[in-house]
Amino acid sequence: MAEEEKMRRQLVLAKPFSLEDEKDSELTASSVIRKILSLIKTVRPGSDLTNFQLPPQLILPRSRLQCYGEMIYSFGGQDLLGECSRRNIPIERLKSVVTWNISTLRPVVVGMSPYNPILGETHHVSNGYINVLTEQVMHHPPVSALHATHEQENIDVTWCQYFTPKFRGAYVDVEVNGKRIMKLLHHKETYEMDQPRLIMKFLPAPGAHWAGKVKIKCPETDLEAELHLISDSFIERFRGNNNRSIKGKIFESSSGNQLYNIFGHWDRTVMAKNLKTGGLEVIYNANENITGLKPPTVKNLQEVMESESTIVWSEVSEGILKKDWERAREAKILVEEKQREALKQREASGESWVPKHFSVVKDGKDWHCSPLQPTVPRAPLVITEK
């Protein structure tokens, strides 16, 4: 019992960043930006910031693996992932995949960054029928793998991604490399999706925006979608406005025949217009899906892996949440030193590290991650119903 209580105290489960949390974030954005500008004044434009070290005051109390997982298991309304398979006709399924993809766009805390996961770190959470497992499968470059399955609707989602942040003077441009693959196994359909880039601006007004083009394609149904995430203009940023508009279309891949127009704002509502009938429908409501988000709770403490993000970074998170910056700094150094020591031991013994849950293959500049198990088991950390 004493050991179990000790382990329970080690788990630090931070609340996901919800839509309503942005107002609090905006109040502190100016002071955060001042700290960042003082840190990067010697960094040249175009520099890769992947290994740039931030002080604890600018770090979120969660791992990047948690941020990836939250995009799937953390939602406040309808199970949009399950809806992708419940639709009876192909065009409705593609629209549902578009809706789910939009739902993975989450607000970003301006000027703040999560922990860079250590090699072999994992995060495993369940929400209803959805089970999500992430693992850090490489460190240079920092490749993260994700596998999610929906027990009831027989859906399989895999990601293999790594990001490249570049300093551009007045902003940081974060390119997210890798594809998202969704398989609707009941329908024998595969959907391949690009990922947007993240623009974090410092001047003239601080702000973080998803931008770029996202393609969603299903070869089996000959249907495709293109979404354009539009970054705010200079004037909008200067006024402190967050436009966050999204425009796009759904069309037949072979003929190019356009079926729907997509438009709206990913942090508000997104509409679809049927070009044949002229009918309009709301396909996504952010207020219903990404507000009131809750952290996971511990269901089975004995099954929590030592590699779990919330254990690996627990001491750092405790320090950050209590604003004990020295404690957080020392704890972060300890985590990083343990990782370096493990690397030295492997090199000394000639041992090669391999991921526990994924196989990883390099294909040109890209990386492909395949889960070793067909489904993700129920997790010891769960999202409980409201």
Curated annotation (Swiss-Prot):
Any GO BP annotation: lipid transport
Keywords: Lipid transport, Lipid-binding, Transport
GO MF annotations, alphabetized: lipid binding
InterPro entries, A to Z: OSBP_sf, Oxysterol-bd
Highest taxon, organism lineage: Eukaryota
Tissue expression: Expressed in roots, stems and flowers.
Family: Belongs to the OSBP family.
Function comment: May be involved in the transport of sterols.
Protein name per Swiss-Prot or TrEMBL: Oxysterol-binding protein-related protein 4A
Gene symbol of the encoding locus: ORP4A
